[in-house]
Amino acid sequence: MPKGILGKKIGMTQIFNEAGVAIPVTVVEAGPCLVVQKRTPENDGYSAIQLGFGVKRENLLNKPTKGHLNKAGVRPVRFLRELKVDDLEAFQVGQEIKADIFAEGEKVDVVGTSKGKGFAGGIKRHNFHRGPMAHGSKYHRRPGSSAAKGPARTFKGRKLPGHYGVERVTVQNLQVVKVDPERNLLAIKGAVPGPRGGLLLVKNSVKVK
């Protein structure tokens, strides 16, 4: 059954296994999350649950969000995200989901928003090759030709310098090394997208190796 939880990236550290090998891990504060709404095939055309995570002062909520949360009978939450599920009967509105839904050794996919790098050139943004660095060269880090003479314009979708980062990124098949159910912490092997404090969605892997 698909399962997932919203969380916050705490940072990276390392854990030593039984053989004394240091494993780099990312610590994620996973939950607790609240089930705010259930999406049914009859009303919405698909099966999903809406999860709420984080704490937000009630006076900062707008009226539609406040009414939505009051209807569900849950406390004010900072983030609302949907997660597709198969069995809606396993979830109830107001139910709390914690980090103990995952077990040590389980493979997960982590979805986050990548760090923003600002305005970047083609070499950094798209891995372009640079030009000759000789003294006579007038072409070092420029993008080069962007189109032919025939159309006399640049087509949409052309790889050019521009804003880099702040994109939805999914890292697949990461291993859960340790679970701390008391503090709702997950230690996930490797790096995950985004800065410290960034919102993450941790869900069971769809391409288990």
UniProtKB/Swiss-Prot annotation:
Disulphide-bridged cysteine pairs: none
Extract the InterPro entries matched here. Ribosomal_uL3, Ribosomal_uL3_bac/org-type, Ribosomal_uL3_CS, Transl_B-barrel_sf
For molecular function, the Gene Ontology terms on record are: rRNA binding; structural constituent of ribosome
From the UniProt entry, list the residue stretches annotated as the region Disordered. 121-154
Q: Which UniProt keywords apply?
A: Ribonucleoprotein, Ribosomal protein, RNA-binding, rRNA-binding
Does RNA-binding count among this protein's keywords?
Answer: yes
> Matching PROSITE patterns, A to Z?
RIBOSOMAL_L3
Q: Name one Pfam family in it.
A: Ribosomal_L3
What does the entry give for GO biological process?
translation
| Top-level taxon in the UniProt lineage | Bacteria
Any one GO CC term of this protein is: cytosolic large ribosomal subunit
Describe its function: One of the primary rRNA binding proteins, it binds directly near the 3'-end of the 23S rRNA, where it nucleates assembly of the 50S subunit.
Question: What is annotated about its quaternary structure and interactions?
Answer: Part of the 50S ribosomal subunit. Forms a cluster with proteins L14 and L19.
Similarity comment text for this entry: Belongs to the universal ribosomal protein uL3 family.
Q: What is this protein called?
A: Large ribosomal subunit protein uL3
- Which gene holds the coding sequence for this protein? rplC
